[in-house]
Amino acid sequence: MLTSGVSMIFSTLNKNWIVDDTPHLFEGVIDDPSKFATWKEVEHCLNFPCFYDIQFIHKVKSGTFDIPKYPRAWARDSEDPEELFNIWKEGHGLIINNFDRGFKEKQKILGEVEKAFHGVTAMHVYAGLMETQSFHIHEDFTSNFIVQVEGETLWDSV
């Protein structure tokens, strides 16, 4: 599922991925980025928030904010889908953590990444409908493999 270009790049990087956190930028190595996320799948997550960890980044303040959760009879407390869509339409940036839940094809992709990097992975989606703010530059505790499906973000390599 990962392209031969990605496999080739991984094999040429002679590094210890566990301790070497030097960032790398590889452009054009994914044949079809829509394998990673589609708008239809994002809409599915917003319609079924009880299965995902959904957050929004404020369109001006560049930080997340609380969204009311409501009790459900057979699932964990979760947000009202209509409210999520309204927040989304207002232009706030969307975060869907654990996007791979419920999507077998995403889990297969993660399996390939886990084989290449010898680690446990998860898939998250960051999206915006219009010009939205992302979060401030920061360092994550975990390593990240970022695939930009569409849009424009300036990425710098070191």
Regions found by a protein language model. Give the residues of each.
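Active-site region of the double-stranded beta-helix
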Residues: L2-I18, D31-K35, E43-H44, F48-C50, ...
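Short amphipathic
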Residues: H24-D31
